Curated annotation (Swiss-Prot):
Mg(2+) 2 binds at D217, E389, E393. The gene is ilvC. Its cofactor is Mg(2+). Gene3D superfamilies: N-(1-d-carboxylethyl)-l-norvaline Dehydrogenase, domain 2 (1.10.1040.10), NAD(P)-binding Rossmann-like Domain (3.40.50.720). It comes from Marinomonas sp. (strain MWYL1). This is Ketol-acid reductoisomerase (NADP(+)).
Amino acid sequence: MANYFNTLPLREQLAQLAKCRFMDSSEFADGVEALKGKKMVVIGCGAQGLNQGLNLRDSGLDVSYALRPEAIAQKRQSWKNATENGFVVGTYEELIPTADVVLNLTPDKQHTPVVKAVMPLMKEGACLSYSHGFNIVEEGMQIREDLTVIMVAPKCPGSEVRAEYVRGFGVPTLIAVHEDNDPKGEGLALAKAYAVGTGGHKAGVLMSSFIAEVKSDLMGEQTILCGMLQTGSILCFDKMVEEGIDAGYASRLIQYGWETITEALKYGGVTNMLDRLSNPAKIKAFDLSEELKVIMRPLYNKHQDDIISGHFSQTMMEDWANDDKNLLQWRADTAETNFEKTPAGDVEISEQEFFDNGILMVAMVKAGVELAFETMTAAGIIAESAYYESLHETPLIANTIARKKLYEMNATISDTAEYGCYLYNHACVPLLADFMKDIKTDVIGKGLSVEDNGVDNARLIEVNKALRSHPVEAVGAVLRGHMADMKKIV
């Protein structure tokens, strides 16, 4: 199989990257009607598989789970997830032949063997659905011409997909139809009904393409969403301990600080996050972030270039073929970092203290969000897609670090995201070595002293204007307006 994106002429590549439209709520007036009476069979019962299935069933749809015989015989977690929630469970051979819609919600590395196994069993004219387009775009999977291929991708972890649905809301969702596989022209209707079934239409839906979803998703998760948070955690912890700050305090400040800081990001963008700082601290964070952007921009460009060219995917798939040798080694190495091995202390840290003593962390989030957004849009990805894959998902990933540090983050994200995270981290830590030499406890660990409270009015006005005028703030204000009812993470 060849990389699908690389087989397209340049003009088509650019058109697919730029495909993104925020859909009006009126476009979902038919609800789940297009899926009513259809048999939906889910393959994979992990976080996304289970929670999407629960939502679809609660929306009145017919949902069952097809699992491998060994998963059923050994009563693995996927079998437990499905059976304990009252779903019908069967083998591929038992359930796929009668399925109208097959939902492939397995991990990326399993997509090729899974699709090759189920495609011969699928009835003529059925629909195959994904929640991530890697298999189509990067692996170039060829799907039978009579099958409709769609994507419905919630922009949140599976647990949030369910939690928001139960609240009567939903999470922002991206939908797409694979243009090479829409023989009956029903792909869009099916994708819209699916998005309604999971509750996504209540939070906003982007009509996109498989290509735009994959190239933006890979970029976001490698850089700001996972790579920058891991890099920042390691560097900030080591710096604080080096400067004599109690290791338990440093560990707590970082483990729970990302979550608290990015909560402000979720509700009011980068502007609101920096507004939580005093004026002197805001200017300091702004200046640090601008310096970080200069240093890290070439690295962000490299990640985007490697994603666009397919080099990243090729390298990762070579590691798949080598039994994940690099991934597993990098995972083990992360477990041995000082931050990961140091328990959070018992000291209580107030919400505001996370901001006051975490100025550098705020700067890193700002730099990472803006760089990821700028790099994606420069590559032809539309602003709405870039927003969802940068600023929007950052609080959701930060929340996983609060639970069990970097281990939980890397366990929650996909192996694809984890692999890219490590690549970024390995390059970024040495890249920031000289920058970190000049960092002191005034920006990480202790906060600014009273003597640092002077502010130049003209400079403050300049900083505030720069914050509010960044393109990620403009598109974010519009998209967040559709998510006003989402619950607080913290």
